[in-house]
């Protein structure tokens, strides 16, 4: 009984945190339609899944790209629907396996469905928790497809590759200049990246021209 009471109290905290989401650019009527946002999430969810399989290239701030037509979104939507149906089939075949597969989509649903997050229509950090489901599925697949010694060897190789990629990515966080330069190199139309670079250059001597160019690009 007390366990359920504690769970219910956590819902109250969640509700309180949700009261002010509109001021942070989350909600309806803020300039991005639910339909266009939902179309964009078809692409976003597949991107998160691909990055879970191999996290490259990672972009700190992808800006607010938006798909506005079915013609642009239907390849993503078709593949996403197929994956959801596959997860439902897995649920029918094996409840634990299906639950893990569905967990990826369910955990993404609050921010990757139809309620627009205007300032960041695609954001890699939303996939942090859902990625646990992908890791579990990968481990189960390796365990079932490979013999135990090969499983250990494969896991060691994957861990080594992931560690190297993590080390390389952490280098981008050594300074604001490096982080936003990397972001701009991968998302060249991102106004926030231009703005932050402009702020960095404006704070330095003899960098006024660079700051001015980035301020113009941010407008």
Tell me the role of every PLM-derived stretch:
Residues 1-219:
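Polytopic membrane enzymes that build or remodel cell-surface glycoconjugates and lipids
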